[in-house]
Amino acid sequence: MDHVAIMKKSWKLLPKIISGEKKIESRWYKTRCEAWGKVKARDTVYFKDSGEPVTVKAGVSKVMEFKDLDALKVREIIHRYGGKDGIGSSDLEYFCYWAKDKKYCILIFLSHPSYVTPFAVDKAGFGSARAWISIENINRIKIKNNHTKI
């Protein structure tokens, strides 16, 4: 299965994925989400900054899901895995605060990151504010040229 992860542009995480500094993509939610139970080892995740085309892809080597989180469990996850998630040691406490009310977490371990020829995706039917899309084949939503799906 293929997935598209829409990233917060101001966090500048795509270069960290390419360099290997960010080895885990984490998703934190108050309720179960699109990615829950769908991301598996050997899947592919395509990454794009919000408002930009897809420019990076990576394989999935492992997935861990956590539910029924509280502030203590959130803190344990962030302190254990935050460094591999591209979070600097000086930012760990900020992220503990940011995620303290989240009830679900997915850790997606990335492998073989690479740049791809930039392409846009058609998010119609997925919700305009959606930050994660799971689809059997990326070509179903890949846009080439002026809004023509491949």
Model-derived features: where do they sit?
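A short, sequence-level motif marking secondary-structure junctions
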Residues: 60-64
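Contiguous surface segments at macromolecular interaction interfaces
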Residues: 13, 30-34, 52-53, 65-150
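Long, hydrophobic N-terminal alpha-helical segment
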Residues: 1-49
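A generic structural signal for short beta-strands and their flanking turns/coil linkers
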Residues: 22, 41-43, 54-56, 104-106
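Short coil-to-beta-strand transition motifs
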Residues: 48-59
